[in-house]
């Protein structure tokens, strides 16, 4: 029996649309992510459990965990009969890399169970492919950090999909999910087909400056450069209360605040525990919209997906 945990992730991290992603885990030790368990069986079966199980597709073959098993077997050239259990702890359409969690945990669990026939690079390629089935296009900014951990920059050159970017251990990432759904497809459709030259220049400056500041250990500069001119100006209209929440977080002392992935989850970066707690409390009171919403104070998850048992 193999059980794999795959952590939540922040796609884009404001400044790196489709090319930056960060894995996060709550500081209190709670698991913010999905688990997949695989054990030997006479034939394949899939069982769904977890807090958000009701949000999964009713048709089993539409479940991404089923598709992970099917694609993995196709890749290794044989059918592996297993009993698979998906523990769905992540809300769907949350901007926390929910589908990436299921994909990463599912493929990694199968690979571990079968004695690691696939390399990490090949696994990551398959993860991007399967994630693309859900979001409509192949992008690695959730699956790469979820699988490998930390802050990852997508390169997709010289057979390198992503590489780690050094980040700041003192940073706390306050994650607030309001309890509503925003589909990735809808959030992409709202973006313009073309951008002004000035926005392109600003985007290049912010992203290059952020990566430089990370490598040269300048946390204040890095946080200042976490600006999004590509998606946030357009997506805020899909996120009730985001602009007010962002302003409140910054006024409370957050170094930066942005949309996690395509939303509706937001993240706020703080460098002091008491600031993070105050930001978290404000978000609990004002940004959450129903009982499904939650706020977690997190750190970067540098381990990525891992075997729990």
From Swiss-Prot:
Gene Ontology MF term list: ATP binding; homoserine kinase activity
EC number: 2.7.1.39
Catalyses which reaction(s): L-homoserine + ATP = O-phospho-L-homoserine + ADP + H(+)
Signal sequence range: none
Keyword tags: Amino-acid biosynthesis, ATP-binding, Cytoplasm, Kinase, Nucleotide-binding, Threonine biosynthesis, Transferase
Compartmental location: Cytoplasm
Tagged with keyword RNA-binding: no
GO BP terms, alphabetized: threonine biosynthetic process
Cellular component terms per the entry's GO annotation: cytoplasm
SUPFAM superfamilies documented for this protein: GHMP Kinase, C-terminal domain (SSF55060), Ribosomal protein S5 domain 2-like (SSF54211)
Xref: Gene3D superfamilies: 3.30.230.10, GHMP kinase, C-terminal domain (3.30.70.890)
Binding residue positions for ATP: 91-101
Pathway annotation from the record: Amino-acid biosynthesis; L-threonine biosynthesis; L-threonine from L-aspartate: step 4/5
Family: Belongs to the GHMP kinase family. Homoserine kinase subfamily.
Biological function: Catalyzes the ATP-dependent phosphorylation of L-homoserine to L-homoserine phosphate.
Name under which the protein is recorded: Homoserine kinase
